[in-house]
């Protein structure tokens, strides 16, 4: 059974073509919307309480428990896109995950953004987004064409400037973050033209999965004869023959094919330690 954890404020239907591909290759798949998003939204988000930590510790955890109930005996695998990879480490039952594939997974520390876009992204996601959220009571992302409307608690987490997840507003309620209980074979896929998913960003998150065997595969568009992939396009059906088999192979076997495109990056990030001035 494969659970797909979506990116921040992305409807689960975005991943339906990828889910169908996995199903056509013999894997059962579960999709879900985080609270306040898509089919899990009911009415206005003004005053609606939801955070990144809720999405992982409550929503993703609930799907994992449901998979265990409804498909007893089946191994549980997870695909996490962007924040969805972080959500996999926030589940109390994360030790049940067999194989984990993340795509562009990080928690948006601004210094990790690609240098060419860093200041623009800092202004957009850490300036304009929280400002509009304070005015509206939620982030009206759909009206702007940026993403789905987003609960204010999620915006507070995303726009925080900390280098460590445990210092984000919603994470302070954890006695200890559950990341270290995940023992899954973990493949982190990053794309060289993804301004969110730089090597530093991917490894900042990977450092939390301290009990997992971790492989970081870095792919350039030219590795698959493309000009661009970016943060979202991995899940577009045009990559069914080039990128999707990488995830499928890992979900089934927990290993990379011999002829996989890209290069593996030597994992160097330590388990996160306190930064000066943070506590």
For the regions a language model picked out, list residue spans one by one.
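Active-site glycine-rich loops that stabilize anionic/oxyanionic intermediates
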Residues: 5-10
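Conserved alpha/beta-hydrolase
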Residues: 12-45
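Alpha/beta-hydrolase active-site loop
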Residues: 49-70
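Alpha/beta-hydrolase fold nucleophile elbow
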Residues: 70-82
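Alpha/beta-hydrolase-fold enzymes
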Residues: 79-166
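Short beta-strand/loop motif that positions the catalytic acidic residue
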Residues: 182, 188-190
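Short alpha-helix in the alpha/beta-hydrolase fold that links the catalytic acid
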Residues: 184, 197-208
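Catalytic active-site module of serine/aspartate enzymes centered on a nucleophile-bearing elbow/loop
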Residues: 219-267
């Amino acid at each position: 059974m494969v659970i797909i954890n979506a990116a921040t404020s992305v409807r689960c239907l975005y991943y339906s073509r990828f889910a169908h591909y996995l199903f056509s290759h013999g894997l059962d798949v579960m999709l879900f919307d985080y609270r306040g998003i898509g089919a899990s939204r009911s009415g206005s988000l003004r005053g609606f309480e939801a955070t990144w930590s809720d999405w992982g510790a409550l929503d993703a955890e609930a799907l994992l428990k449901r998979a265990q109930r409804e498909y007893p005996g089946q191994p549980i695998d997870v695909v996490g896109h962007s924040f969805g990879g972080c959500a996999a480490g926030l589940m109390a039952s994360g030790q049940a995950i067999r194989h984990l594939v993340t795509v562009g997974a990080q928690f948006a520390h601004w210094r990790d953004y690609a240098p060419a876009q860093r200041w623009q992204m800092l202004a957009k996601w850490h300036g304009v987004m929280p400002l509009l959220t304070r005015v509206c009571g939620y982030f009206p992302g759909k009206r702007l064409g940026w993403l789905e409307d987003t609960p204010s608690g999620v915006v507070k987490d995303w726009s925080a400037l900390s280098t460590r997840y445990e210092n984000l507003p919603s994470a302070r309620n954890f006695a200890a973050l559950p990341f270290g209980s995940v023992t899954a074979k973990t493949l982190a896929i990053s794309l060289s033209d993804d301004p969110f998913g730089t090597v530093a960003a991917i490894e900042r998150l990977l450092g939390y999965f301290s009990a997992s065997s971790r492989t970081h595969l870095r792919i350039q568009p030219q590795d698959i004869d493309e000009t661009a992939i970016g943060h979202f396009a991995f899940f577009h059906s045009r990559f069914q023959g080039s990128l999707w088999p990488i995830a499928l192979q890992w979900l089934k076997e927990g290993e990379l094919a011999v002829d996989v495109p890209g290069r593996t990056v030597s994992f160097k990030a330590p388990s996160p330690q306190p930064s000066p001035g943070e506590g």
